[in-house]
Amino acid sequence: LDKFSINVPGDPSSAAFFTALTLLKKNSYLKIKKVGLNPTRIGFYSLLKKSGAKITFSNKKKVNNELVGDVIVKSSSLRPINASKKYYLNTTDEYPILFVISALIKGNSFFSGISDLKNKESDRIKEMQKILKQIGVLSKFKNGKLLIKGKKIEKNITKKINVPNLGDHRICMSAAILGLLTGSEVRIKNFETVGTSSPNFLKIVKQLGGSFEKKNL
């Protein structure tokens, strides 16, 4: 995967996956146009900025009484993430990709008050733990708090990541981004579920230089 610059229009939850890719890939840049900047929608970005992410908002204006603007993301050297339970409601959908980011930051990241993630389209805590373990990243969940023992991966690790048929679009996309960042081969069953929220996901991946093929697994 080469360094890249790209503009992605639209939804902040869908763009979160490419935000992760941008932050962790050297010399990369992302611009997301016309994003809703209501404080209840941008917990993901606020949390990452606390960890050193180079994320800024520009061209802000009110549209139908809602704040809208462009989100600009640049490659960053991130510190481990410490997400208290107050972030849960504003960041619910983005936790799987936050777990991926944490896995690739050297040090311990903590996520508190996230027990409800066990009751989404899949048990997102358990399933992401399984995925991260396949690249050698350990984690522990206890009393509503997840610890991820991240490690910085400098070179392609050429691992194989297998994701079963969970029917969970956010797990699928998170695993795909993990594969792009680590050089791993990822096999994801029922990837079609991604179309429910991000029908252009694979198209954008291809534009960035990623490769994929569809098989009957």
List where the protein language model places each region.
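Short, structured segments at the rim of ligand-binding sites
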Residues: 1-217
